[in-house]
């Protein structure tokens, strides 16, 4: 199937959450994902069948091959460098596998939308956040070292990334 045919058959997702989930397997909870919820009606992988897990991985791989460039995957990998130990999602391994076979680019907001949803509550201190920002070149304001202030920063950043991702996907006709 040629690339144009694949594009013409792109599904229309009912919400930004499902669209991001299908594209990146973005977890909604520690062991769950938007796509697993959409596929199984559950809140995590625990209630999914083996076939559903395989189907989810296939969707993520397809989306990454279609929409991410090697440069985008390097950005994702840099972000994951700080969270590999806590990762329970196969996206880390998929990104390594797919890195050299991705034909085209995707806006950075897509990457941010995924990463912020996945790791907002895993970043425990401002020092980690500052290092993350320096390594990726993504500016994140630092309000202070108290946890409440850090949470406010992360929540504001997460909301902005999701708004950007939703607008882009709406413009492309991927969500209603």
Please place each PLM-identified region on the residue numbering.
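Short, leucine-enriched amphipathic alpha-helices that occur as contiguous helical runs
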Residues: 72-73, 108-117
């Amino acid at each position: 199937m040629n690339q144009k045919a694949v594009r013409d058959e792109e599904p229309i997702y009912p919400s930004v959450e499902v669209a991001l989930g299908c594209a990146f397997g973005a977890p909604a909870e520690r062991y769950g994902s938007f796509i697993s919820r959409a596929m199984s009606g559950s809140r995590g992988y625990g209630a999914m069948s083996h076939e559903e897990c395989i189907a989810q991985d296939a969707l993520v791989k397809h989306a990454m091959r279609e929409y991410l460039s090697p440069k985008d995957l390097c950005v994702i990998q840099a972000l994951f460098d700080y969270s590999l130990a806590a990762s329970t999602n196969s996206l880390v391994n998929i990104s390594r596998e797919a890195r050299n076979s991705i034909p085209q680019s995707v806006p950075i907001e897509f990457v941010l939308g995924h990463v912020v949803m996945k790791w907002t509550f895993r970043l425990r201190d401002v020092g980690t956040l500052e290092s993350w920002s320096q390594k990726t070149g993504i500016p994140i304001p630092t309000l202070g070292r108290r946890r409440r202030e850090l949470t406010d920063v992360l929540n504001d950043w997460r909301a902005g990334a999701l708004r950007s991702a939703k607008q882009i996907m709406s413009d492309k006709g991927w969500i209603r």
